[in-house]
């Protein structure tokens, strides 16, 4: 069975994702720019009302993934505030200006999250060298990488995703994301070998259809 993670912005969307059968929730603000950190109040409400594993986006703004010291301070504060609220994990990522993983910043961010699973988000799709970047993410101890293979969609990036799955082995989970729908999900899985997929909740039916295809029910 392939795990389905639904990206949501509101309590209503989180509840809809749960009803639709999603296995995990990624809670964000501003999904139009790829997601930013949601408020502590929203995090608490979703965790309390949904009763599903909730991963929280830690990202101070849209745009690139190269962060100044004050932005990193804000991200650390957000992790400190989110952790006691019962979250299941965090979703984050930081790059250097040369397109490599910012290992120092990632270590800093992962320190207060110790014990929580960490997803390295789609900042991975703009790294200069995916093979090298994946090894850095593995060495950091992240639980999974969310990627479209550097393409506009997971289907378009299927070859690259499959290569990452092979490289990762059992060391880290590769989660495919990028316009995965009920209509193309089986093709994405067959071409990549991923065991987890990530999809934006467009409506309850969109996730329900995806779950039906991937859970076989």
Per-range role (PLM):
Residues 11-13, 24, 37, 43-103:
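Active-site beta->alpha loop and helix N-cap motifs at the rims of alpha/beta catalytic domains
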Residues 35-62, 100-123, 156-182, 207-217:
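Alpha-helix-loop-beta-strand connector modules within alpha/beta enzyme cores
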Residues 25-36, 81-97, 140-157, 192-210:
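Glycine-rich phosphate-binding active-site loops on the catalytic face of alpha/beta enzymes
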Residues 4-8, 25-27, 54-58, 90-92, ...:
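Hydrophobic faces of well-ordered beta-strands that scaffold small-molecule active sites
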Residues 1-25, 30-33:
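N-terminal pre-domain/capping segments
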Residues 9-20, 66-81, 118, 125-140, ...:
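Catalytic cores of alpha/beta
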Residues 10-12, 29-31, 60-62, 96, ...:
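Active-site-proximal loop/turn and secondary-structure-junction residues that shape catalytic pockets
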């Amino acid at each position: 069975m392939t795990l389905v993670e639904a990206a949501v912005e509101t309590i209503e969307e989180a509840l809809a994702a749960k009803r639709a059968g999603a296995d995990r929730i990624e809670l964000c603000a501003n999904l139009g720019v790829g997601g930013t950190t949601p408020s502590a109040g929203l995090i608490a409400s979703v965790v309390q009302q949904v009763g599903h594993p909730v991963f929280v986006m830690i990202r101070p703004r849209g745009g690139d993934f190269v962060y100044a010291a004050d932005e990193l301070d804000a991200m650390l504060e957000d992790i400190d505030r989110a952790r006691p609220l019962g979250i299941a994990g965090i979703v984050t990522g930081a790059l250097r200006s040369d397109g490599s993983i910012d290992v120092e910043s990632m270590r800093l961010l992962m320190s207060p999250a110790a014990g929580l699973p960490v997803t390295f988000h789609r900042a991975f799709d703009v790294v200069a060298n995916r093979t090298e970047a994946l090894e850095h993410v593995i060495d950091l101890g992240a639980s999974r990488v969310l990627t479209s293979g550097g393409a506009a969609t997971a289907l378009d990036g299927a070859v690259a995703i499959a290569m990452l799955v092979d490289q990762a082995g059992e060391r880290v989970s590769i989660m495919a994301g990028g316009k995965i729908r009920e209509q193309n999900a089986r093709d994405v899985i067959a071409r990549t070998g991923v065991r987890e997929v990530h999809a934006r909740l467009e409506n309850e039916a969109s996730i329900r259809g995806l779950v039906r295809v991937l859970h076989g029910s």
